[in-house]
UniProtKB/Swiss-Prot annotation:
Residues 286-307 have a biased composition (Basic and acidic residues). This is Mitochondrial fission regulator 1. Residues 286-315 are annotated as: Disordered. It comes from the Eukaryota. It comes from Pongo abelii (Sumatran orangutan). Belongs to the MTFR1 family.
């Protein structure tokens, strides 16, 4: 049975023109030889069916007399026409039927633009009408008047607070002055606050004036305290002291011979002991310096004076021989 099926398949492939080896072993993932069906389809001589073409015609030219009735090209308008012809058992194109004159209802239907039917309610009609500008202006004026009244009340409260604070300060000062005297039997009640002014404008002016008066009083009180308090000694300014340093001239003072001579050294002075030890340690440097002075022709008196004056210096350093090597290298180069 299997052998018979293989022979049948080979015969079919031979008639088509495809070899069995190429079908089984070719793995081409693209092109006309990708599958057996494609190979069979390419080798068979099949006639392709003609494609259906549709033409969209406008509604204005559909019923016009100038439109040719012998147009054999089908369009989407034929679909609607066929749907309307429900009584006929067979469907016919519009070109096969005699054209009838258009009715007025049809013309009105085609002339009207397609409109969308909305099932939702129209809320725009239910909205209340807008208020007139006169009513809006009246409401704005009422709000402004209310704000002005609130501002006037706030200014009156500020004026009351300021006056109460001033009265408290005055009563506190009177109590401080009378503490050293007799104590009154009963404290006097504070005076009632003054009535608020009638208009908001006068209220604002009075509050501002009270604030200014308080500031002036504070400033005057500070000035009097500064005047009455004793002045502190001012710190000297170093810039003013050092301003004339460049113009200062020093005069030369001649010293006496007693001042030039070295003072006798105390044996118990630690500084003298350290100086003697350093002299002994760095004596070679002192000798080299004295030899240089002799070579330069310095008189003995000056060399002795310098040796007596200069106790410490580079002549006390210990020679290492590095300076001589450097000097020789420089002289050779």
């Amino acid at each position: 049975m299997l052998g018979w099926i293989k022979r049948l398949i080979r015969m079919v492939f031979q008639q088509v023109g495809v070899s069995m080896q190429s079908v089984l072993w070719s793995r081409k993932p693209y092109g006309s030889s990708r599958s057996i069906v494609r190979k069979i389809g390419t080798n068979l001589s099949l006639i392709q069916c003609p494609r259906v073409q549709f033409q969209i015609n406008s509604h204005a030219t559909e019923w016009s007399p100038s439109h040719p009735g012998e147009d054999a090209v089908a369009s989407f308008a034929d679909v609607g026409w066929v749907a309307k012809e429900e009584g006929e058992c067979s469907a016919r194109l519009r070109t096969e039927v005699r054209s009838r004159p258009p009715l007025q209802d049809d013309l009105l239907f085609f002339e009207k633009a397609p409109s969308r039917q909305i099932s939702l309610p129209d809320f725009s009609q239910e909205e209340p009408q807008l208020k007139t500008p006169a009513l809006a202006n009246e409401e704005a004026l009422q709000k402004i008047c209310a704000l002005e009244n609130e501002l006037a009340a706030l200014r009156a409260q500020i004026a009351k607070i300021v006056t109460q604070q001033e009265q408290q300060n005055l009563t506190a000062g009177d109590l401080d002055s009378t503490t050293f005297g007799t104590i009154p039997p009963h404290p006097l009640p504070p005076p009632p606050p003054p009535p608020p002014p009638p208009l908001g404008l006068h209220q604002s002016i009075s509050a501002v004036d009270l604030i200014k008066e308080r500031r002036e009083k504070r400033a005057n009180a500070g000035k009097t305290l500064v005047k009455n308090s004793p002045k502190k000694p001012e710190m000297p300014n170093m810039l003013e002291i050092l301003k004339d340093m460049n113009s200062v001239k020093l005069r030369s003072v001649k010293r006496s011979e007693q001042d030039v001579k070295p003072k006798p050294v105390d044996a118990t002075d630690p500084a003298a002991l350290i100086a003697e030890a350093l002299k002994k340690k760095f004596a070679y440097r002192y000798r080299s310096d004295s030899q240089d002075e002799v070579e330069k022709g310095v008189p003995k008196s000056e060399s002795e004076a310098t040796s007596e004056r200069v106790l410490f210096g580079p002549h006390m350093l210990k020679p290492t021989g590095k300076m001589k090597a450097l000097i020789e290298n420089v002289s050779d180069s």
